[in-house]
């Protein structure tokens, strides 16, 4: 199974389909390695380094969406939202920015189903574009 993922290492975004990257997961600890010309792989990022974040793709084949993406969505009154995984309902949702900021990652999200929300466009992510979250209060 080829699952879409990406990793923010605190400075750069690395995608699962980048050349020579391998993601290793054991229990809840993960490490992203890069193979350098057949030598010992270099550690690119890890769940234990205190700055890196692993984000899974939503699995929707017609949309390239990842946990943490900031999207503009709606039909007439466009607004910004954040793609979040709701651990209580086991699904990805589009969470309005204000709700995202208030919840601060507690796992249960009030938001909209991605499948029912059209159209939407990725305009950034919470790590590389935090300024897109400003002004929502």
Residue ranges and their predicted role:
Residues 1-137:
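Secondary-structure transition motif
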